[in-house]
Amino acid sequence: MTGWQGERQKVEWGEIERRLETRLPADFKEICEVFGRGAFCGYLELLPVDSAGPRSLLGRWTAMKERWANPRMRARFEPYQVFEQSGLILWGQSVTEASYYWLADASASPETWPIVARTDPLEELHRFDVSTSEFICRVLTDRDFRPFSVASKVKSLYFEPYG
């Protein structure tokens, strides 16, 4: 789809999944290994999975858990909660502050987890019963996938690696 031919990344999924206490969707893992750090069409970024730094998938999940006691924080995500056996796990974002989560459930197959997303931290959350890869594809290519589509702004599909 993007013509990307970079070197495949090695990711320690066992450690990430051990800390989360759940497996992650196979298509997300495949995308991370094939593309590594970067952005699709200069817009949609997957959170880094090669570290536990504050901007990584694990770092953002940890920070969200730590702030969850704040009632204003919880109100911004109602009716959902941060993942602890079930709940939201942030996996991606856009350069315009859109946020992409799984509505994860450790007792269910990760391939069945819906996507919950919003275009802005103060906007409403939208639920999509699609895989991670389908969600990414629709954001980039489906002009009718509102309010998340950037298809009308993207002339060709590409992946821009970071660092």
Which ranges hold each PLM region?
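Short, surface-exposed beta-strand/loop "edge" segments at domain boundaries and coil↔beta transitions
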Residues: 97-100, 121-129
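A surface-exposed partner-binding patch
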Residues: 1-98, 147-148, 152-153, 159-163
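A generic structural motif
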Residues: 92, 118-120
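Low-complexity, glycine/alanine/valine/leucine- and proline-rich hydrophobic stretches
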Residues: 101-108, 116-118
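A generic structural signal for short, non-catalytic loop/turn and secondary-structure boundary residues
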Residues: 83-84, 108-110
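Compact, glycine/acidic-enriched structural inserts
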Residues: 117, 125-144
